[in-house]
From Swiss-Prot:
The lineage of its organism: Bacteria, Pseudomonadati, Pseudomonadota, Gammaproteobacteria, Vibrionales. GO terms for biological process: pyridoxal phosphate biosynthetic process; pyridoxine biosynthetic process. CDD domains: GAPDH_C_E4PDH, GAPDH_N_E4PDH. This is D-erythrose-4-phosphate dehydrogenase. NCBIfam families: E4PD_g-proteo, PRK13535.1. Homotetramer. Transmembrane segments: none annotated. It catalyses: D-erythrose 4-phosphate + NAD(+) + H2O = 4-phospho-D-erythronate + NADH + 2 H(+). Pathway: Cofactor biosynthesis; pyridoxine 5'-phosphate biosynthesis; pyridoxine 5'-phosphate from D-erythrose 4-phosphate: step 1/5. GO terms for cellular component: cytoplasm.
Length: 345
């Protein structure tokens, strides 16, 4: 049994805990603690009731020291609640934590990870792109087999790299990618404003529900970290749209061989049924963003939107639930980190 602690109980932290149970991985993963500055009542309420994902199927209760996830009227899992701002004070050693899932969105350096380890954790997995000096950055399904036991501080990348990198891998292996551009069409996030208010980014001073808002993105850097050969070969832009969840990615790549639309789509179908099963999905149904809410895949390709120009310019539309898909990959990566330790032992 892998013992994990969740540091930060916001959108991703709560989805990670919920995914442990909804994916059936509670047979492999035990959440022993959650560290969050908010009050237990609010933590329990937001875990039980979620605007995007609906009610959690497990009953949640709490006291001042624990969350309780109930299996039935008599069986439940207690999860220790902590309210500590300093990593160094966290009791990971006493709780025998194997991996900290750091979902704060604040910490992300090798030093931050080392602080968790010095507090007693064996390893750390960040829920966002970390600094370049981390031991590894994993996009599950693409490079998780590179994990080694000595990789103690690891990043799970971002929701958008988890979405687009598997598709880039498939296209490159099949056709050879020369260059590409990406437009991320991302749902609103909690760094935006409900009504106009101050923010360091002037575009994000504007009400999230009233505009399509361009924001900065480092997605191309995330691609380069996984595929160094694509250094300076990809560019990306991102806009936020007035929806609460689900992201669409408009991918355009120039390839080195001549293809037709069916060639591209069939390559994705083959990958979704084999090497990237449970990571990539494919659809030709006339769906819209809400239909991908709570979808556990990293990427879902809409084959009806695939286009090919002049044989070598390929455009694709790729969907993802930027919360739920990513939370499920956090669990996959954590289990892969555990497996890497067992192999080398």
């Amino acid at each position: 049994m892998l013992k994990v602690a969740i540091n930060g109980f916001g959108r991703i932290g709560r989805n990670v805990l919920r995914a442990v149970y909804e994916s059936g991985k509670h047979q492999q993963i035990k959440v022993v603690a959650v560290n969050e500055l908010a009050q237990p009542e609010a933590m329990a309420h937001l875990l039980q009731y979620d605007t995007s994902h609906g009610r959690f199927g497990k009953k949640i209760s709490h006291d001042q020291e624990h969350l309780y996830v109930h299996h039935d009227s008599s069986e439940y899992d207690p999860i220790r609640i902590l309210h500590l701002a300093e990593i160094e004070l966290l009791p990971w050693r006493d709780l025998e934590v194997d991996i900290v899932l750091d979902c704060t969105g604040v910490f992300g350096s090798q030093a931050d990870g080392q602080a968790h380890i010095e507090a007693g954790a064996q390893k750390v997995l960040f829920s966002h792109p970390g600094a370049s000096d981390l031991d590894n950055t994993i996009i599950y399904g693409v490079n998780h087999e590179t994990l080694k036991d000595e990789h103690r501080v690891v990043s799970n990348g971002s929701c958008t790299t988890n979405c687009i990198v598997p598709i880039i891998k498939v296209l490159d292996e099949a056709f050879g990618i020369e260059s590409g551009t990406i437009t991320t069409i991302h749902s609103s996030m909690n760094d935006q404003q409900v009504i106009d208010a101050y923010h360091n980014d002037l575009r994000r001073t504007r009400a999230a529900s009233q505009s399509i808002i361009p924001v900065d993105t480092k997605l191309h850097k995330g691609i380069e970290r996984i595929f160094p050969k694509f250094s300076n070969k990809f560019e990306a832009i991102s806009v936020r749209v007035p929806t609460v969840n689900v992201t669409a990615m408009d991918l355009s790549v120039t390839i080195s061989t001549n293809v037709k639309v069916n060639d591209v789509n069939q390559t994705i179908v083959n990958a979704s049924q084999c090497t990237l099963r449970d990571i990539v999905d494919y659809t030709e149904s006339p769906l819209v963003s809400i239909d991908f809410n709570h979808d556990p895949h990293s990427a879902i390709v809409d084959g009806t939107q695939t286009r090919v120009s002049n044989g070598q310019l390929v455009k694709m539309l790729v969907w993802c639930d930027n919360e739920w898909g990513f939370a499920n990959r956090m669990l996959d990566t954590a289990l892969a980190m555990q497996a890497s330790s067992q192999v080398e032992q």
